[in-house]
Structures are given as C-alpha cells and as structure tokens.
Amino acid sequence: MKSTFKEERIKDDSKRRDLFVFVRQTMCIAAMYPFGYYVNGSGVLAVLVRFCDLTYELFNYFVSVHIAGLYICTIYINYGQGDLDFFVNCLIQTIIYLWTIAMKLYFRRFRPGLLNTILSNINDEYETRSAVGFSFVTMAGSYRMSKLWIKTYVYCCYIGTIFWLALPIAYRDRSLPLACWYPFDYTQPGVYEVVFLLQAMGQIQVAASFASSSGLHMVLCVLISGQYDVLFCSLKNVLASSYVLMGANMTELNQLQAEQSAADVEPGQYAYSVEEETPLQELLKVGSSMDFSSAFRLSFVRCIQHHRYIVAALKKIESFYSPIWFVKIGEVTFLMCLVAFVSTKSTAANSFMRMVSLGQYLLLVLYELFIICYFADIVFQNSQRCGEALWRSPWQRHLKDVRSDYMFFMLNSRRQFQLTAGKISNLNVDRFRGTITTAFSFLTLLQKMDARE
C-alpha cells in the first residue's frame, strides 16, 4: 500500500503541467495578458471574449493614464509653494502610475511575442524529471516553491496598495485614497462614489501590474533553478544511465553505485528539489543492450541538450527583462527615498494609518527589489555548478572513454549566466545592498533640502 502510494506520488510529480497558471491569471487582471488565451477557436464566444478583453484593456489604460495625468497637473499647480511633503507624495504616485502604464504596454503591446515564446517554450520543453539513474529529482519542488512565492508576493501587493482605500473609510471625511487635484468638486453625491471607484480600480491595477512584472521574473528564476536541479541529477547519474542502457546486471550496478556514493558526499546539491533513490530492481527492467560508448554518448548528449535548453531560455528571459530592470533599479531607488522621506514627515495626530500605509509601500518596494536580485543571484550560482555535478559521477571508472567529453562539457559550462539590468549592472544580492545604500543617501540629501526651507 505504502509502495503504491509512493509510485502514484512520483508519477504525479513527473507529470507535465502548466507552470504559469497563477501568474498568468494575475497578468490578465492587470490587462498585461489577454483573457482570450483561455478561449480557443474563432466562434461567437471567442469574438465576444476578444471584444471584452480589448474593452477591459482600454478601460485600464484610461484609469491609469487619467490618474497619472491628474498627479502631473497637481505637481504643476503646487510647484514652488513650499509644501515639500505634498510635492514628494504626488511625485511618488506619479512614478508608480507611469510605471504601471509602461508595464502594461511593454507586456501587452511592445513585446508580447517574446513573452509568449518564453512561456510556451518553458511549458512545452522543460524536463519533468531527471534521467534514469540511482537517484532522481522532479520539478515538483521548484513548482511548489514558485507557487508559494508568487502567491505570497501577489497577496502582499494587493494588501499593501488596497490598504490606501481604507483611509477615507476610517477618517469618514469624504476624502479620496489618492490626494490629487480634480477640475471639479468630487465631494458631490454620486460624483464622489464614481471617483472613489476609479481610484480603487487604479490601486488594484497598480498591485496587479507590479506583482505581474516582478512576480513573473521570480517564477521564471525559480523554475529555471528547478531545471538546473534536474540537470545536476542527470549529470551525476550519467554513468548509471549508461549502464542501464547497456543492460548491466545487479552486481555491476551495485559496484557502480558504491563508487558513486563515495563521490556524492556534498550536502545542499539542489536549490529546490529533493533527491530520491531508485530501487535497483527497477533499473534492471529496462532490458536494453548497448555498448558503453554508444550508451554513454546517448546519455551525455541528452544532458548537453538539456543544458542548451536552459541557457537558451535564460537568454530569452534576459532579452525580455534586461531593459525593464535597467529602468527599475532607478525607479526603486527614488521610490524608496521618497517613501521614506514622506514617512518621516508624517507627524500629524491623524497620520498613524497613513504612516502604516507608507510603511507598507516601503516594505513592498524593498520586497520587490529583493526578489528581483535574490532569485537572479540563485540562477547565477546554479549556472556555475554543472561541472561540480558531473564530477560527482564515478568518472574514474571509465576515464579513458569519457575524458574528452567531460573536458568539453566542463569548458563550456564554466561560462556562467548572469541576469542583468540593461547589460550594465548585474542582478545579485550586492546590487540589492547597493541600491538601498544609494536610496538612503538621496534621503539624507532630501532631508537637508527640507531643513533649509
């Protein structure tokens, strides 16, 4: 019974599935991905869905553009009046909504082809589990981790931005969540409700857009790290895979396993996967009979093809996200600086909830920068470890036969892959620390300017 349950679990973990369900739904809410993806064909229903999709997209543009425009007008009207706190607060919202508009256009209109290529290639071609050998890993661990991270991040974004909607309700003064200039009296009955609804929609769009752009990057990095885990296990078991294709007997498999176990002593070999052992009896069921040279070449070529697939996917991700992160690093730097400044200026008696909201904004900005840099760093570290995985196989047993192939792979795999911001700055934990340092340097300068006034 226990064995049957384990077999069913392994079979379920090895199934091919859509890896982007939740993040794709979030992009649809943000109008960064078409709802029509879920409707195939060209019938009446498909036409209706496309029409509703376009209407929803245009409405979202209207909401975001009109709020950004109102804030720009507010900055222009109040410029030079000495209220630096209000000016900076308007500048924060202007940056946020301009970035929201830019992300919608970039994902939906500027580069949808590359986005679809990345998602479809990873979904269609990823390896669900490692090659046959003494042990195996599946994509289940990285898939679960990607779902956990993206859901946590998306919910935090929604909570952080929608919290602003609670302020007017708490104050009960018919104020708006976003304090900006309007060319009419928005406090009139009926008008206030419509304006409040539009601002609420705008805040939801901000949350969805920020969560989609950074969240998809995080999911891609976690899944690629999962593919590296699968590759590492396949490389470690490349000789075991060869022996299985040769039709080795139990004695030969036991001897090879003993030598591999002696070499396989490093803990923490995988980023997200849990390694499981394969019973030797199952390896005997394959029933193949090849010579070692042919069997090894077949097993090794599969590993090389998998490595090329991972590198090709990373190049597409870099091409798509590198321009975004080039602008994003500057945007995050200024946002952290401005939000921290406004938080320190909020000292009025009724500003407690506003300080909480600003504190949430600051934490979300830091959280976003962290996931961008941290998961890119994980990918970079994994890209350097292919050679280590290969050395965990008992290579000395067939040194003469495998030496040239091993050396060829080692030389090529040493070229690690680094995700960047505009091909200028590497995305890693050092970039995270450096951006925070720069932001608080600007904060100090801003506070000195405010003190002079």
Swiss-Prot record:
GO cellular component terms listed in the entry, alphabetical order: cation channel complex; dendrite; dendrite membrane; neuronal cell body; plasma membrane
Keywords, sorted A to Z: Cell membrane, Membrane, Olfaction, Receptor, Sensory transduction, Transducer, Transmembrane, Transmembrane helix
Keyword Glycosyltransferase: no
Record localization: Cell membrane
Keyword Protein biosynthesis: no
Transmembrane segment boundaries: 29-49, 86-106, 149-169, 204-224, 323-343, 360-380, 409-429
Spans within the Extracellular topological domain: 50-85, 170-203, 344-359, 430-453
GO biological process: detection of chemical stimulus involved in sensory perception of smell; olfactory behavior; protein localization; sensory perception of smell; signal transduction
Membrane topology: Multi-pass membrane protein
Side of membrane Cytoplasmic, spans: 1-28, 107-148, 225-322, 381-408
Gene Ontology terms for molecular function: ionotropic olfactory receptor activity; odorant binding; olfactory receptor activity
Function: Odorant receptor which mediates acceptance or avoidance behavior, depending on its substrates. The odorant receptor repertoire encodes a large collection of odor stimuli that vary widely in identity, intensity, and duration. May form a complex with Orco to form odorant-sensing units, providing sensitive and prolonged odorant signaling and calcium permeability. Involved in the behavioral responses to pentanol, ethyl acetate, and propyl acetate.
Family of the protein in this entry: Belongs to the insect chemoreceptor superfamily. Heteromeric odorant receptor channel (TC 1.A.69) family. Or2a subfamily.
Summary of subunit composition and partner proteins: Interacts with Orco. Complexes exist early in the endomembrane system in olfactory sensory neurons (OSNs), coupling these complexes to the conserved ciliary trafficking pathway.
Miscellaneous comment: The atypical heteromeric and topological design of the odorant receptors appears to be an insect-specific solution for odor recognition, making the OR/Orco complex an attractive target for the development of highly selective insect repellents to disrupt olfactory-mediated host-seeking behaviors of insect disease vectors. Odor-evoked OR currents are independent of known G-protein-coupled second messenger pathways.
Protein name (record): Odorant receptor 83a
